[in-house]
Amino acid sequence: MEVNYCPETPLLSSNDHEAIDHKPKLTGMVSSMKSNFFADLPQKLRSKIDPENPLHLDVSKAAGLKEDEKEYYERQLATLKSFEEVESFLARSDEYTIDEKEEEEDRAERAAQELAMQISNWANIFLLALKIYATVKSGSIAIAASTLDSLLDLMAGGILWFTHLSMKNVNIYKYPIGKLRVQPVGIIIFAAVMATLGFQVLLVAAEQLISNEPSEKMNHVQLIWLYSIMLSATAIKLVLWIYCKSSRNHIVRAYAKDHHFDVVTNVLGLVAAVLANAFYWWLDPTGAILLAIYTIVNWSGTVMENAVSLIGQSAPPEVLQKLTYLVMRQGGDNIKHVDTVRAYTFGVLYFVEVDIELPEDLPLKEAHAIGESLQIKLEELPEVERAFVHLDFECHHKPEHSVLSTIPNDL
């Protein structure tokens, strides 16, 4: 997706007849837009505005509005919030100095993330040993499924740890734009392994149901061991999930998702094994099948989510609006028009492409300074990995890049 602005209708201008000769002044524009927006709101919404924090208006609870009206006002509020974020960002970046306290907090956070990964890996080793013993003692296929899950947890944890280490060591001559894409690739491999496990368990459980061969019932001692090991494993995974879920690191959050998944599979596996032992044998493989389906659906979704991030999907309109506003604010009066603002995923973060029109007689030195400062500001945004700013003296031309639909045959 891209946003195109021709000279006849420059961005944020409401006066079409003045568009060719006048570009809107953006200084104080957010305040003006906020005032106009709130002044035009229906009375039923204006009465709910908090004077101290008007942008936190909860439109969803407003009575008497249709759903599409609520959606419209929510989008307008979100746009105003994003513009305010840009203003705050520009103000902070202009005053920014290296803060030793911030650097220390950043180092502490990275250390905490590495600790979370290491604790998760050691916990997976310990739990695998416990579950192997529980499987041998109980003979339950549902517990065996949970044990296989722990085995793959250990393997997948190794993949994520390798991914983390690989991202830290970058040869800029071999990988000139870094190795951030290793992260979604590692998560895809991790999720694919987990989904494969689910399919394998599904086959084994279905085979046991079809063959109609019930497993032997567990005695009192076996049940005690089963309860002790599975409940301990569940408690450990629950603590790890709580510890990891608040992290901002995507790899640590992948660990957190796995820990949450293990809590669910451990509880369901234990319930299925105990009920099968007490009542009907087929409850055990049935529980294993349910776990397998949950595994396949859960991790297949993770595969698709990360795969999409690697194929260049466009940023949503809200992000494009925010970027466009930043371009107009940062560029100053020398930018005649914004021709294109394009943002797309290339891993976790966005790549941004901007085409702007500058005066034809502007000296190269000044034009370069405008483009470079705009690129730097765009790349300072937390959601942007890399920005490309193209300078032109007119915007009436064909697209400068073609989109390939096939791979050339000579490659």
From Swiss-Prot:
GO biological process, one term: seed development
This protein's record includes keyword Lipoprotein: no
Membrane topology: Multi-pass membrane protein
Vacuolar-facing ranges: 137-140, 206-222, 284-287
Transport as UniProt keyword: yes
GO CC aspect terms: plant-type vacuole membrane; root hair
Residue intervals passing through the bilayer: 116-136, 141-161, 185-205, 223-243, 263-283, 288-308
Compartments, as annotated in UniProt: Vacuole membrane
Protein role: Involved in sequestration of excess metal in the cytoplasm into vacuoles to maintain metal homeostasis.
NCBIfam families, A to Z: CDF
Assigned protein family: Belongs to the cation diffusion facilitator (CDF) transporter (TC 2.A.4) family.
Protein name: Putative metal tolerance protein C3
Record organism: Arabidopsis thaliana
